[in-house]
Amino acid sequence: VPINSKQKGKRGEREFAKLCRDHGYDARRSQQYAGGVDSADVIGLPGIHIEVKLRDRITEADKLDFIKQAIRDSQMSAKFPIVAHKEKYRQWYVSMEMRDFAYMYTVAYGAPFEGGAVTKTFQVVTMTVEAWFEVYKEFEACMWLKAREEV
């Protein structure tokens, strides 16, 4: 029995929100009425705009389309756009713009990201959700400390 794509999307959003909660964040599906600016699929990660994609198969072209949607939808929010995606029977991955990831990494670890040259051209980096959360947690802690110092 084929699954309705809307139901599959909701299931993916619930799964990813649970994964975020497992990492210590109070994440949940957002109330998406009509899409548009800052209509993230999942909310609860400070500073992050999350789009979730659950598909049978995801190509590199799909990832590029997904991240472009996340960028477009997050333009007015000043949040880093990410795409959490999962193919059938596989683990979760996160894709985001290379320059955004390089910035998060540099803030988190106080050293430049050496995973590749960051150029002015549009580049996307993809990693396991566990690897992404490792960097994100350090980044968030550094930003929290920085905000405390400014008070």
Segments the model singles out, each with a brief description of its role:
Residues V1-V151:
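Catalytic phosphate/metal-binding cores of nucleic-acid and nucleotide-processing enzymes, i.e., regions
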